[in-house]
């Protein structure tokens, strides 16, 4: 079987970056949040710019959390201000770094989904300059998965070179930067992008590129917590795993559970071999408006063989939390 190489590319704080570029502001140094301020402060922020996240604000915060975090940061900042007083405010992280007398400020941009879709279409056209449409799987408005195997061989380049080439083209075309993950399967490429890339030092353009293979995944990801950081692992899934003493991917990998032919656990835990996701591409993507089928193997298929063999042997009803599970360590 041919060894394959996949790229996962995620546009950094996409909605916030689009709004910054529309205002001729640097997406990496401008404090901006995308939210409908006309609603209550409980409204969810669709995006938070990287410089604003630096104050401990999560990407999907509610607006009141942004207000609270910035207020707390300003209280600390005021202690170092000349005369303990602010002389102004700024939403630029560069200005704030150079002038301790300025209070932290931020911009609130109302969401414009149709506008973001237009930008996504434009960026997709950039991808098509480097990769054929059959090798691009559109995962979301700001994220794609790419089979890079044939391009690396044909052009005699590394996966990192190809990822950087694509990302820099997007940056030149739109002013928006991105993060990339590289792996021998889609799962590892996405985990490299979602988790490992956050620990990689960004370059001068804010680009982060991370690579994971099976051995590196064992070394770096088996002890990572929380489990909800992993692709397709939600709170409910995490809670069920913790109820039987599994807190990390390493814990899961060390358990061989149930008979090899037993599919009951996979179905109940939503770990079917294949998941077909039907999406409609917006105008301008590939050959126009048509329905396409994007296939994503779920965690049970993506995960390396040593973890993919995980099973659960249950003597009684698996839905009953009082039942005992037989854990077989391998």
Identify the meaning behind each predicted range.
Residues 1-283, 288, 292-318, 327-329:
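Gly/Gly-Pro- and Ser/Thr-rich, intrinsically disordered tail segments characteristic of DNA damage-repair
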């Amino acid at each position: 079987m041919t060894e394959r190489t996949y790229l996962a590319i995620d546009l950094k704080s996409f909605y916030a970056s689009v709004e910054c570029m529309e205002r001729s502001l640097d997406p990496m140094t401008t404090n901006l949040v995308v939210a409908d301020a006309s609603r209550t402060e409980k409204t969810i922020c669709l995006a938070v710019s990287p410089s604003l996240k630096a104050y401990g604000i999560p990407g999907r915060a509610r607006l009141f959390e942004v207000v609270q975090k910035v207020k707390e940061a300003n209280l600390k900042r005021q202690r170092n201000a000349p005369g303990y007083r602010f002389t102004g405010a700024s939403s630029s992280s560069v200005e704030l770094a150079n002038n301790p007398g300025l209070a932290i400020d931020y911009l609130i941009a109302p969401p414009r989904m149709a506008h973001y879709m237009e930008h996504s279409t434009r960026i997709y056209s950039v991808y098509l300059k480097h990769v054929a449409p059959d090798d691009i799987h559109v995962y979301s408005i700001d994220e794609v998965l790419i089979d890079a195997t044939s391009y690396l061989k044909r052009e005699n380049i590394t996966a990192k070179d190809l990822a950087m080439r694509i990302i820099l083209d997007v940056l030149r075309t739109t002013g928006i930067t991105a993060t990339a993950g590289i792996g021998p399967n889609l799962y590892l490429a996405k985990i490299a992008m979602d988790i490992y890339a956050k620990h990689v030092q960004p370059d001068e353009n804010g680009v982060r590129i991370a690579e994971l293979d099976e051995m590196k995944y064992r070394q770096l990801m088996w002890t990572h917590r929380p489990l909800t950081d992993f692709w397709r692992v939600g709170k409910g899934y995490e809670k069920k795993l913790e109820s039987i003493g599994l807190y990390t991917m390493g814990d899961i990998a060390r358990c061989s559970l149930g008979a090899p032919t037993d599919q009951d656990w996979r179905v109940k835990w939503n770990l079917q071999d294949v998941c077909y996701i039907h999406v409609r591409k917006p105008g301008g993507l590939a050959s126009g408006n048509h329905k396409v089928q994007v296939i994503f193997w779920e965690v049970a298929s993506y995960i390396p063989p040593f973890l993919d063999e995980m099973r659960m042997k249950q003597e009684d009803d698996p839905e009953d939390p009082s039942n005992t599970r037989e854990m077989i360590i391998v």
